[in-house]
Amino acid sequence: MPRLMHGRIVTEEELKRAAGDVAEFSARSPARFAFTPPVDSHSFDYLFPSLQDDEANLLPEAANMPDLLKKLGASMAQADVPAGDSAIPAAYTYLGQFIDHDITLETGSGALTDLLDPGMTPLPVAEIRHVVRNLRTGALDLDSVYGPPAPRDGAKMLIGNVSSLGGTQPPIKRPPGKSDDNDLPREPRSADIEHDRAALTGDPRNDENLIISQLHVAFLKAHNALVGQGLSFGEASRVLRQHYQHIVVHDFLKRIAEPAIVDDIVTSGNHWFDPAAYPFRMPLEFSFAGYRLGHTMVRAAYNFNLNFNLHGGIPATLELLFTFTALSGDLNDFDTIPDNWIIEWENVIGTGPNVSHARKLDTNIASVNDKALYNLHTLTGATEAPVDAARLPVRNLLRGYRLRLPTGQAVAHLLGVPVLSKDEILAAVNSPAQAAALQAGGFESRTPLWFYVLAEANHFHQGERLGPVGSTLVAEVLIGLVRRSEDSILRLPAWKPYLPSAKAGTFELADLLRFAGVLGSGQPPRTYTVKKGDTLTAIARSQLGDGNRWPEIYLMNRGTIRNPNQIFPGQVLLLPPAQPTGPIPKLYTVKKGDTLSGIAKAKLGNANRWPEIFALNRDVITNPDRIITGQILVLPN
């Protein structure tokens, strides 16, 4: 698929052309390609449709509204001052972007010319529901990694090599310990700028800046590390997807949202977003407002590696990070990323003194001399024109108006959470110009939802995390998307992370980077190859020190072991941590005539507890009224 620059909306015609390009490239390429089913587009719709019934819940439809929103967006520019940083390591900004690219690729909301038209008005609700489409699966399934045209090398994913500069001193020195395989696989040179050295990934946007590009490489390496331990392609992709889902819920969300809201949705279920609804629709309020929090987290410059940093090196500005991965003409004769641009992850994740942090979640967007997210580029490297086209905050505000997003106050009132007053909105901004732009548009009382989410984060948490509206929007949808994923860990309540981690019982982004071998010294997963005469009990005794822990091995490998009494020489089994992280699971073998309520009565003392058994076994039971003799079920502890 041709590359996409940040903030650009893809058209249906481009998608049709891209599908043909992928087919043509696949036919002439010697590489195998990761197989994923074709993605059918689905609609966007409102998470809170009742708010569309009253115009008072929306921004006023007025002739000067686009101009007022442009002025508000322009007022959000702020110099990149480290004193304004959050406690969130900068890597999570780009994990958030990676997640976004995994779940949404929007078409139909309008080209820039439509958006910037001074006479632009909101689209009718029916047109929004019909025309605005999502081209991703809408699940946390890594289709941005595994989807076509991502090439495979057997069971492994193909990784590209960097271009060696041969330098021994900064700024052209390769970071120590970094190998050649640190770039995305790429198309060859082409006279067509949309394909010239474009990345072969499931989503071309994962090549729009160097940090997300290098994060994508880390996911490819993590997959290959699993295959290197003997797992098949399917097994490795399942393990990686499930640990990725754990990172999204228990690491990423716990950092950027209110943990109590996250925990409530995980344990009590979704209250507003129904991930099982058919037909499935992606919430507009999430995609075009709530989840655009990452734009305020972006820095204008980073500590990137020994060559490009804020401590005596050349600053790794956002301009350079976009240029040196988009390959838009400034790389002369290089076919791939120069090796002096390989990331050193310890600069953007961890607790060290030189770690770059995300900016605070507030109403300010990083800008240095009117650059960064106020200086978006075309594929040729030129600044978008007119000036408002280059300003990402302006685009966000105009698109929210065009798509009839409700105001932040209307959403807060519906959710039953504290509604920010006019004075609280004004107090959350950090410049007289921004306050003036708010008042000029009457936005302090009817605030654009995206702006409100950022102001609320500043008001309630001083920019360290989202407030109640933002937390609800983001956590409801991301947790719901985990629930609707094929390999969902939330449909397997007994599931726990089992890849090596710094803290037992959890798995964070840094653990994935270590496991991929791109941060510090990674550890391989614990695996065991079955030998003739082995049993799960014997394996548990020899590998875990306790034969009674065999159910842990069984549950970890239930996708490949149908019967725990039948394992075969050559099977590669994943092993849990040597130290137990919880009680040993209880199992039950279904007998003829059993029902879930009967099992609940016999084993739990209460027939009404059958839904608990069903919830624990959603990966093997699709209908609670149909269980099969010989099935092995997990019981609640």
Predicted regions and their residues:
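Mobile, glycine-rich extracellular loop/lid and propeptide segments
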Residues: 209-226, 239-240
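Primarily a LysM-type cell-wall glycan-binding module
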Residues: 523-547, 571, 579-607, 611-614, ...
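Generic detector of short, aliphatic-rich beta-strand segments that form the cores of beta-sheets
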Residues: 567-576, 627-635
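Short alpha-helix capping/helix-loop boundary micro-motifs
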Residues: 558-562, 618-622
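Acidic helix/loop microenvironments that form the catalytic cleft of cell-wall polysaccharide enzymes
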Residues: 240, 244, 557, 617
